[in-house]
Structure formats: structure tokens, C-alpha cells
């Protein structure tokens, strides 16, 4: 950003008083790195720490940030403020050092709220679909020439980044309910895609507490703001009378203000009509598969329509939508002859979904777009607590594929819970008699164990929120072919 652009931006958004150097603990996370990227482009000195380099830290380094791949007290020296992710414990040496030096320590959402405070904020919340919906809203606003700032929890593929600093008053951001920190945000518009029981440790196992927290989030809207909510979701329908703000509903339901009708999927694209009250119908081609993505698009269209964005810009943005990283992310189609000697090919798709509802939506999108494919899933459960709390739901959903390989639970810092492990889940699924899951205890054996189940007309879904995305990229790099050293090590 040049000096003239920066001066123009600061005429819209005042800089934080006496803050020059901002340090992020856990800077390699998508949400943390996105905020750091926006602040770096605003001219702040950025530093941060994490355990290992990744594309987020590489991008920040290219912008001039100083990244430490360790956690040491001296890393926070001279920082004006320290921003901490929810994954960082209070006894982290950098947090302890900041407190001792009387440096303010704030959560990620507090810094996001500061970015939003002087802008027209659009916050996207909900259990599922936040990242994709944030990308859709951002794409529509960009297509309309509104040059928004956006901060997303996943890679916006069209932009090649998780976050971007725009020069207008608009800020579009994913709002995270996992630690209730979205209560710091005070947007002008809020989308709520759905509400399900997830991250229940934050809410002390009380679903009513979770629901009330969403209501409290919506009450952060000014009285002239707007809540955009999916009326198909039974919890949202129940909560609507308690919102107390102007609302626009969307969904397949007949009473939705923005209604999805005549949905059909052809390959990776969805085709449908959006009916809007008092507005012309929109005949949409969406470059993203699945009915769940039609709902995400309806939310984005509801916000854009309220803003007065032209229909042709909306339609162009949705038809050219490139998606987000690890959301039904097509990694290639590979011939099987070098893999297992069979004719034909296998498609490889990587997806972040890790809740039964998300996995179910991904499976349905795959079945709808490629009904004749042999559907093979490599699944990595995420967190022992989630596996325990949603055990039966996972067992039911995962029986819908034709072949299932399962990695060990990705713990995300949790201790193992008896009966909530991958071996137990495989046993439960096997006992139901529909499929015979394969437990892959060593990730290095994935290609070797995958090859025999491929038929020559396959769609492979690599599914989960842990490090399974790295395995998906590795499978793409080796074109699914088991490696010689792999066979020597395990054969």
C-alpha cells in the first residue's frame, strides 16, 4: 500500500493510539494470520510466534513481519500489545512475560473488533458454513467494486490469501463462536448460518447457554443493523422472536424472505432460483457444489441485496466463485494404472468438514454431482471430546460412503478419552454391517492402504480439520501412487 492510499484509509479508520508494534502468539493460525496481514498492510510493525512455518507465516514474512518459531519471553520485547489465540495457554512464556512487563494481552477477537469499530462491519457466524459464506460475501462486494477488507478463517482462493486490506469502509469477517469471543464484535450486519451443539466445553455442556450467547452476539448489532438468519435451521427458527433486531431470513423454506427454489447440481456447480421479496428473481449458477452452498449463497445475496449491490455483479461473483481452501477442494484426477494396475481414474477432493453435519453435506454434494463414482473417504476425527459427544452421529454419517479409511483422532491438545478413539468408532461402524472401515494407525501407510480399494471410477474425499490436509496434498503430489520407501518401511 502506498503512502497516499494509507493516508486515505486512515481518514476512514483512525489508527490505534500509541500502538506501533503488535505481537501475535500463535500467528500461524488462519484467523490470527489474517488479522496480522491486515495490520501489516495498515503499516503496523508485526511480529509473532508459532511452532513451525506454514503458508500463513510465509505470507506474513513477505510483508515484513518478524516470525519466531519458538515461544520465548524475549519475543514480546518492545511490543505495544500482545494478541493471543484461544489455543494458547495462560502459562505460555510469552504471555507470562507480557503480563510481567505490563503489556496488554488481548484475544484475537478483541483486535478484530478494533479493526471493525470504525468500519461497516459484516460478521458471519454459525456452526457450519462461516468460511465459505464469508468468502462469498467478500467476492460479491469485490465484484461490485466496493473494495472490502476481509478477514477469513480459510484461504480465499480467488485472492490467494486469508485476509486482504481494502480501501473502503466495509470489513467482512468470520466470527468465531468456539470460545464465545465473537461477543467482542459490534458489526452492522450479522449472518447466522445455523446453530448446533459444538464446542460445548466453552458453554459448560449447556445448549441453552450456547443459544443465549448467539442472541447476545446479535444484540451487539445497533437497532438499525440487520441480522440475516437461516430459517431452515430449527434452532434459529426458535430464536427468531428473541432477536430484537431487523431480520432477513433465507432458506429453502416457503416462508423465507430470500428463498432457494428449483435446486439442481450438475458436477461441481449448483443451479437454482432465488426468490426475493419485492425484487426480481435471481437465476443463479453457483460454482460450488451442494445444497448447503446454495444456502451460503442465499445468505450472501441477502446481505448484498440489502446493500443495494446490482444483480449482475451478484450473479457474476457466484458463477466465478473459486471457493476456499479445504472446502470441497479439487486436487486433481489421477490415472490408476500406476497406482494399482487398474484402468480408469480417481478424483481427489480435500475438505475441512469435521462435524457430522458438515461431513454429511460433503457426502451429499459428492453423490449429487458424481452419482456413479465409488465414494472413498479418508477421515480423521478431530478432538476426543467431539468424537465422544457426537459418536453415534459420526457412526451414522460415515456409513454412507462406499469405502472408509480412518486415521487416529487428531487430539488438538486433548487427552485421549476411552471409547472415543478411532479404533472404537471403526468397530461400531463395522458392527452395523454396511461397510468395513480400515484403521490407518500410521499416516505414512495411507497411499499403500488406499490403493487396493480404488476401482477405476473413484472420488476420494479426504475429510477432517487436523493435519489430514497435509496428507491430501501429499497424495496429490505422489498422484496416489504408493512410494517404494513406504513399502520398504512397512512391508
Swiss-Prot record:
UniProt pathway: Cell wall biogenesis; peptidoglycan biosynthesis
Single GO MF annotation: ATP binding
Pfam families: Mur_ligase, Mur_ligase_C, Mur_ligase_M
Annotated EC: 6.3.2.8
Entry's Gene Ontology cellular component terms: cytoplasm
Enzyme class: ligase
Matching InterPro entries: Mur-like_cat_sf, Mur_ligase_C, Mur_ligase_C_dom_sf, Mur_ligase_cen, Mur_ligase_N, MurCDEF_pg_biosynth, UDP-N-AcMur_Ala_ligase_MurC
Keyword DNA repair set for record: no
Name recorded for this polypeptide: UDP-N-acetylmuramate--L-alanine ligase
Biological source species: Salmonella typhimurium (strain LT2 / SGSC1412 / ATCC 700720)
Gene that specifies this protein: murC
Amino acid at each position: 500500500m502506498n503512502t497516499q492510499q494509507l493516508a486515505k484509509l486512515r481518514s476512514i479508520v483512525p489508527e490505534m493510539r500509541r500502538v506501533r508494534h503488535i505481537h501475535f502468539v500463535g500467528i500461524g493460525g488462519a484467523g490470527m494470520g489474517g488479522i496480522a496481514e491486515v495490520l501489516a498492510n495498515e503499516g503496523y510493525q508485526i511480529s509473532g510466534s508459532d511452532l513451525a512455518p506454514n503458508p500463513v507465516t510465509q505470507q506474513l514474512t513477505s510483508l515484513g513481519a518478524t516470525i519466531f518459531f519458538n515461544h520465548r519471553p524475549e519475543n514480546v520485547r518492545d511490543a505495544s500489545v500482545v494478541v493471543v489465540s484461544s489455543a494458547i495457554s495462560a502459562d505460555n512464556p510469552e504471555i507470562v512475560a507480557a503480563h510481567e512487563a505490563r503489556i496488554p494481552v488481548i484475544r484475537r477477537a478483541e483486535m478484530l473488533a478494533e479493526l471493525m469499530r470504525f468500519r461497516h462491519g459484516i460478521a458471519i457466524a454459525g456452526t457450519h458454513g462461516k468460511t465459505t459464506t464469508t468468502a462469498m460475501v467478500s467476492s460479491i462486494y469485490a465484484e461490485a467494486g466496493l473494495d472490502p477488507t476481509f478477514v477469513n478463517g480459510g484461504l480465499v482462493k480467488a485472492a490467494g490469501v486469508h485476509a486482504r486490506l481494502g480501501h473502503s469502509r466495509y470489513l467482512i469477517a468470520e466470527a468465531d463462536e468456539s470460545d464465545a469471543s465473537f461477543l467482542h464484535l459490534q458489526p452492522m450486519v450479522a449472518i447466522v448460518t445455523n446453530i448446533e451443539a459444538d464446542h460445548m466445553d466453552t458453554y459448560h455442556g449447556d445448549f441453552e447457554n450456547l443459544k443465549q450467547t448467539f442472541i447476545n452476539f446479535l444484540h451487539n448489532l445497533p437497532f438499525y443493523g440487520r441480522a440475516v438468519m437461516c430459517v431452515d435451521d430449527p434452532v434459529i427458527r426458535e430464536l427468531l422472536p428473541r432477536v430484537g433486531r431487523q431480520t432477513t431470513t433465507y432458506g429453502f423454506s416457503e416462508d423465507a424472505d430470500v428463498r432457494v427454489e428449483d435446486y439442481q447440481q450438475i458436477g461441481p456447480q449448483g443451479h437454482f432460483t432465488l426468490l426475493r421479496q419485492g425484487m426480481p428473481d435471481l437465476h443463479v449458477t453457483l460454482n460450488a457444489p451442494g445444497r448447503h452452498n446454495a444456502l451460503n449463497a442465499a445468505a450472501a445475496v441477502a446481505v448484498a441485496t440489502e446493500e443495494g449491490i446490482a444483480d449482475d455483479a451478484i450473479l457474476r461473483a457466484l458463477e466465478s466463485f473459486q471457493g476456499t481452501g479445504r472446502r470441497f477442494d479439487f486436487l486433481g484426477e489421477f490415472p490408476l494404472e500406476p497406482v494399482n494396475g487398474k484402468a480408469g481414474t480417481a478424483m481427489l477432493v480435500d475438505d475441512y468438514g469435521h462435524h457430522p453435519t458438515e461431513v454429511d453435506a460433503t457426502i451429499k454434494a459428492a453423490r449429487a454431482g458424481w452419482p456413479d463414482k465409488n465414494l472413498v473417504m479418508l477421515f480423521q476425527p478431530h478432538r476426543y471430546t467431539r468424537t465422544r459427544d457426537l459418536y453415534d452421529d459420526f457412526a451414522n454419517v460415515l456409513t454412507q460412503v462406499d469405502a472408509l479409511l480412518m486415521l487416529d483422532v487428531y487430539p488438538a491438545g486433548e487427552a485421549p478419552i476411552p471409547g472415543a478413539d478411532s479404533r472404537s468408532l471403526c468397530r461400531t461402524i463395522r458392527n452395523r454391517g454396511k461397510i468395513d472401515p480400515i484403521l490407518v494407525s500410521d499416516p505414512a501407510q495411507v497411499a499403500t492402504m488406499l490403493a487396493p480399494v480404488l476401482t477405476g471410477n473413484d472420488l476420494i474425499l479426504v475429510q477432517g480439520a487436523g493435519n489430514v490436509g497435509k496428507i491430501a496434498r501429499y497424495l496429490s503430489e505422489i498422484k496416489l501412487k504408493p512410494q517404494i520407501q513406504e513399502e520398504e518401511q512397512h512391508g
